[in-house]
């Protein structure tokens, strides 16, 4: 989901995360931190934090950074000066300890979209369908990713950042994993199911290609996480490019799947010719179009409106309905009559 950004946007985002912090490098901010620390965080003058701040892991030093950031930002806005970023992020009003409340809310909206999608897959795809288990597992990776996204936007800490990034990478890689299985027909065919009208035959075990693809994806993910974990400093550029390559490959495959019948690349169902193109196939192309359009929001990076809504939070808002569109497509594809003719 986070990997559908164009090259330029992704690199800019990575660079911004690491270096775009003119606000926290300013002498004014540094002096404010010293004054605040002496006045509120010293042993003699320690100020107790509110319960929401303590529950979300804020320290006195963190609270000083927030207070100084907001004070300087308020003054800059009043004087008509530009708004600066601090530690690679725009200044947001916090709410109950949440650093980016809009992104938290929209992450939870995406979580809800995956809950709805999971319920739809379980309810409308027959249990014996060879792709059902893959879609269910992908839904769970999505649920996991959006929970950690909400946690990360609540408190931007090293551990929450890594859990967010690693969970997102797992979701994107698993999406590519099941896409290859679906489009290249690597799924195992059960002996008996409600999708086939053929005489029961011995079950087809998992193919060597399927096993090799599964092992490759596992190795790629483990290597990815290990590399980022063992480095002395998190490699933001590599992380974003990794997700981008996986995400764009996923999108490209489904875009090829959605091509007109006259130029079809994939045989969408093994029992049908390449020219067989049900109407719902167009939804895959619409999905790619919408994800690209949603990602374009990141091109218009701007200081948060009212210090609440920024381009990144709007991107999260846009991805929730896109997820619902995708689940609808997966179910329609799984319920096509051509699956009844699949044989081991």
Identify the meaning behind each predicted range.
Residues 1-20:
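Fungal secretory targeting signals
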Residues 19-344:
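Multi-pass alpha-helical transmembrane bundles in non-GPCR membrane proteins
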